[in-house]
């Protein structure tokens, strides 16, 4: 056991394959202590140390925590150096070399898989830091595992990097109206670290699928499971034929937008493009358009969520698994295997086994509420105290609710044409602080000026300056990056809030037979027993109140969620 490590204190851990654990921590005088513990069962040792309640520090959850999660160990607290490097320095990588370099103000190094350089070869084999300050690529490739002393030195370097990161996030401004004891960027670093751990857990646990229900849905939508490529092609032609039968003339390739536009002209429908939203108004009066739109839904399922998807991504234990990421460019979580875009038609199959249920919570109007908090707009914050904030916005704008919703969304996404244009003028008059905040972000994007989200994530727009300078300030490129920045400061902050909420829910579920099984931008799914569902629902809701109390501190913004207990995801309304 590491001597002197208290609850919540950083404890760097490196798993040495076949040898044990390397640990590093600070003693009472601030010095770094390190040791290697030889053990045939490092996971069991971590579980023992977990009783002390340390904040585990690792280079990345994917590299260290995956083995712990697979063995049933769910750490309570962690600091993920890779995740914090993405937050603090705006990195697109989270490997040890990039995180170390960023923490020390060095240029981002090449990935360690490349050829060794003269600087790598010039040093001694045990020189972990090169003459230029970068980490040795031999060590990045795993040379630290050669002996116990090297492994403990690697853990000490990990702890040093964490300390530099903590100093960095604590130095960032806390933009809340009422700051707390711990600055918001530091709290964001903690929740981003937990999100990286949660991503590993989501990959391990998977999403429960009722295979019989799924197979019935797929059969009804795209046809029986094909036994050959010929059968698959025949099923595709059969789906196409349903649409062709509704139109006069020869069949066309329904996957070619230009040909589909010509096809629509045969029934008197002239449209500039064939996007589904543009065709939907015609569906009620035109059976041909209705058939085309139904075909598109079936085609999407067939090509993205068909039989091959089910065979590839759903395990023998009837769990849908994909690769999860804790943050993309603006901070949102990502997932493969279609987890973030599962069609509504297939959601009845997201259903745990008998005796278990899903607690589903959907954040209400989260991005507009976040805009109210991060912009400091008192009038918009007042609207955000209501269950439905679009209702008071409509009254303030003198419009109906649908127009008010369009105006708020258009403001965040930079839309200025159509019905949004007139409504935006009223937004400027009624919510000047929110609109000024969005315009400032857009201008920064157009000029290639770095931004930080409310929680401290660096959006590295300065890397675009050469491109923007060549294109010009009024170019399509400049407008595109401006709109990206305008939305990213809201969407990124909303992602930070969501992950802070998810981390709080995860902590609240400790000891319960319950696991988070899906994170979907503004929606959370927790699988639990029917007996514990009510208590778990209470944890989810109290976690949102708790998170909102410090994340929105002083803004007056209220967060709301629609929480329900359901047997399948489709039952949630």
Predicted feature locations:
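Short, contiguous acidic/charged loop-to-helix segments that flank catalytic cores in large enzymes
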Residues: 305-312, 328, 360, 379-381, ...
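Short hydrophobic beta-strand that contains or immediately precedes a catalytic carboxylate
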Residues: 78-79, 358-362, 561
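Polymerase palm active-site segment centered on the conserved acidic dipeptide of motif C
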Residues: 218-253, 430-432, 436, 441, ...
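Short active-site loop/helix that positions an aromatic residue
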Residues: 62-73, 85-92, 260-268, 364-379
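Function-dense linear segments that define catalytic or interfacial modules
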Residues: 152, 320-400
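Conserved catalytic core of nucleic-acid polymerases
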Residues: 200, 204, 392-519, 530, ...
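Conserved DEDDh/DEDDy metal-dependent 3′-5′ exonuclease domain
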Residues: 3-175
């Amino acid at each position: 056991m590491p001597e002197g490590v208290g609850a919540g204190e950083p404890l760097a851990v490196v798993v040495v394959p076949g040898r044990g654990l390397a640990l590093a921590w600070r003693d009472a005088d601030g010095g770094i202590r390190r040791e290697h513990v030889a053990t045939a069962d490092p996971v069991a040792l971590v579980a023992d140390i977990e009783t002390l309640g340390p904040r585990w520090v690792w280079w990345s959850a994917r590299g260290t925590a995956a083995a712990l999660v697979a063995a049933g160990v769910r750490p309570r607290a962690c600091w993920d150096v890779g995740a914090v490097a993405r937050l603090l320095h705006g990195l697109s990588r989270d490997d040890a070399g990039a995180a170390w370099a960023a923490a020390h103000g060095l240029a981002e190094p090449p990935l360690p898989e490349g050829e060794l350089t003269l600087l790598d070869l010039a040093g001694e084999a045990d020189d972990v830091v090169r003459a230029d300050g970068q980490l040795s690529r031999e060590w990045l490739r795993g040379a630290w595992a050669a002996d116990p002393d090297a492994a403990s030195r690697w853990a000490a370097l990990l702890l040093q990097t964490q300390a530099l990161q903590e100093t960095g996030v604590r130095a960032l401004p806390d933009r809340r109206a009422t700051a707390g004891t711990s600055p918001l960027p530091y709290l964001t670093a903690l929740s981003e670290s937990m999100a990286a751990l949660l991503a590993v857990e989501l990959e391990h646990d998977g999403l429960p699928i009722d295979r019989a229900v799924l197979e019935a849905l797929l059969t009804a939508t795209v046809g029986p499971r094909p036994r050959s490529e010929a059968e698959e092609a025949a099923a595709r032609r059969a789906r196409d034929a349903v649409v062709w039968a509704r139109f006069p003339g020869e069949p066309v390739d329904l996957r070619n937008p230009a040909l589909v536009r010509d096809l629509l002209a045969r029934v008197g429908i002239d449209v500039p493009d064939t996007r589904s939203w543009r065709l939907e108004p015609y569906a009620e009066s035109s059976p041909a358009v209705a058939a085309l739109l139904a075909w598109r839904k079936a085609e999407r399922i067939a090509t993205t969520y068909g039989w091959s998807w089910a065979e590839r991504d759903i395990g023998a234990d009837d769990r849908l698994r994909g690769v999860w990421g804790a943050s993309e460019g603006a901070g949102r979580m990502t997932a493969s295997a279609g987890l973030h875009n599962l069609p509504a038609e297939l959601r009845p199959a997201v259903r745990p086994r008998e005796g278990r249920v899903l607690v589903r919570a959907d954040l209400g109007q989260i991005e507009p509420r976040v805009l109210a908090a991060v912009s400091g707009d008192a009038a918009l914050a007042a609207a955000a105290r209501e269950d439905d904030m679009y209702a008071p916005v409509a009254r303030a704008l003198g419009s109906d609710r649908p127009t008010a919703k369009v105006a708020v969304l258009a403001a965040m996404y930079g839309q200025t044409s159509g019905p949004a244009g007139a409504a935006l003028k009223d937004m400027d008059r009624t919510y000047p602080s929110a609109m000024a905040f969005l315009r400032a972000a857009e201008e920064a994007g157009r000029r290639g000026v770095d931004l930080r989200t409310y929680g401290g994530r660096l959006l590295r727009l300065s890397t675009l300056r050469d491109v923007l300078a060549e294109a010009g300030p009024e170019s399509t490129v400049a407008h595109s990056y401006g709109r990206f920045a305008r939305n990213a400061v809201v969407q990124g902050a909303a992602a930070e809030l969501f992950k802070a909420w998810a981390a709080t829910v995860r902590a609240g579920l400790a000891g319960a037979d319950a696991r988070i099984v899906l994170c979907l931008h503004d929606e959370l799914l927790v699988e639990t027993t029917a007996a514990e569902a009510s208590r778990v629902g209470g944890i989810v809701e109290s976690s949102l109140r708790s998170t909102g109390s410090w994340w929105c501190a002083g803004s007056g913004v209220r967060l709301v969620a629609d929480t329900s207990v359901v047997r399948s995801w489709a039952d949630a309304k």
